[in-house]
């Protein structure tokens, strides 16, 4: 114990406050801390100004903390992969002489002086403004020559056939192609087995003539020499088919695709042996015998002449003229009149100038 230690009376926390009132205030604070008293106490009544007054007489302020919600930024969607066309069309500017329909919009290509686009491989025709619709469309390549047998075209080559076969991947197309080839072979075999009366007569004539000539010329060498001298080269080269009232001449070039097909150039004379089938006839040129499509030839009757066009000519339909191209084969149907003659091409008949015709 020191001298400074003196028992001091507790001083009130606020000036002018008695010790008794300070004790009461402490009691009230302890009462607030106990849970039982907290449940029993009524809530503070709000005053007119909206403030709540506590038990101690002072206002109670409520502080609200606003929680700001952070918006998560959405990630941008990934860019779709760019599609790449491995076999696009090869379009080129093309002038359509005849009206064609667009393969995209199915409308006729008539605007801009009939200019449009045509694929180099598959021959697809479209408008220029329709090109964007076929950018991702695959080009199926060149059409195989096996389905173009009704046309005279230089596409009949092994090299182009191999290219078209390499571009072809459709199994349905392969099945149909094989079926068509097998059907043609079976049909041709059946036709070869049937005997044609015309061919039988042609084969029997030389056989029946040989024994008669042998009997009459036995031991007569002098007479044989005389008969040989009397025979002219024209009589030897005569063919049985040309002794009839008509014969056939090739209009177009036909190149054989199979072994039993008959190959011939335009203007060649052909002897028809079997015409029972509408799609394939059997004919003979010299010693060659084979099948060919009938729309490649034309019938020439007695008194008619065959000509070759030496120069292209555009005729006037109003006066009955016909338009023909160079090297085309035609048949004359009448006499010359005014420098023009009536000709027939198998499909069209009209007047053509005689100066542009060469007889074959």
Swiss-Prot record:
Chief place where the protein resides: cytoplasm
Residue ranges of the region described as Disordered: 1-86, 187-241
Biological processes annotated in GO: neuromuscular synaptic transmission; positive regulation of protein localization to plasma membrane; positive regulation of voltage-gated calcium channel activity; skeletal muscle contraction; skeletal muscle fiber development
Zinc finger (Phorbol-ester/DAG-type): 88-139
Keyword field contains Zinc: yes
Membrane topology: Peripheral membrane protein
Protein's name in the database: SH3 and cysteine-rich domain-containing protein 3
Originating species: Mus musculus
Gene encoding the protein: Stac3
């Amino acid at each position: 114990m020191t001298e400074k230690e003196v028992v001091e009376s507790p001083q009130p926390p606020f000036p002018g406050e008695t010790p008794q009132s300070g004790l009461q205030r402490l009691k009230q604070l302890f009462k607030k801390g106990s849970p039982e008293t907290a449940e029993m106490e009524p809530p503070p009544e709000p005053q007119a100004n909206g403030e709540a007054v506590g038990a101690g007489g002072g206002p109670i302020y409520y502080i609200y903390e606003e929680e700001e919600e952070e918006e998560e930024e959405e990630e941008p969607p990934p860019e779709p992969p760019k599609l790449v066309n491995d076999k696009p069309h090869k379009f080129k500017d093309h002038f359509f002489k005849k009206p064609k329909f667009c393969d995209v919009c199915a409308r006729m290509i008539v605007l801009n002086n009939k200019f449009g686009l045509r694929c180099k491989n598959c021959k697809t025709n479209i408008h220029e403004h329709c090109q964007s619709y076929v950018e991702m469309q695959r080009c199926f390549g060149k059409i195989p020559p096996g389905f173009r047998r009704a046309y005279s075209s230089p596409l009949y080559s092994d090299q182009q056939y191999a290219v078209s076969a390499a571009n072809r991947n459709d199994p349905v197309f392969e099945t149909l192609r094989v079926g068509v080839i097998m059907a043609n072979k079976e049909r041709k075999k059946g036709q070869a087995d049937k005997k044609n009366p015309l061919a039988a007569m042609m084969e029997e004539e030389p056989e029946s003539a040989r024994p008669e000539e042998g009997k009459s010329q036995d031991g007569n060498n002098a007479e044989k020499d005389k008969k040989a001298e009397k025979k002219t080269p024209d009589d030897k080269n005569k063919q049985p088919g040309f002794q009839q009232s008509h014969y056939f001449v090739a209009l177009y070039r036909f190149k054989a695709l199979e072994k039993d097909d008959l190959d011939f150039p335009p203007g060649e004379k052909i002897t028809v042996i079997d015409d029972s089938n509408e799609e394939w006839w059997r004919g003979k040129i010299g010693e060659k015998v084979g099948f060919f499509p009938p729309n490649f030839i034309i019938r020439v009757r007695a008194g008619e002449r065959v000509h070759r066009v030496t120069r292209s000519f555009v005729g006037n339909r109003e006066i009955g003229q016909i338009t023909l191209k160079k090297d085309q084969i035609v048949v004359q149907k009448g006499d010359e009149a005014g420098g023009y003659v009536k000709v027939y091409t198998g499909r069209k008949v009209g007047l053509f100038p005689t100066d542009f015709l060469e007889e074959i």
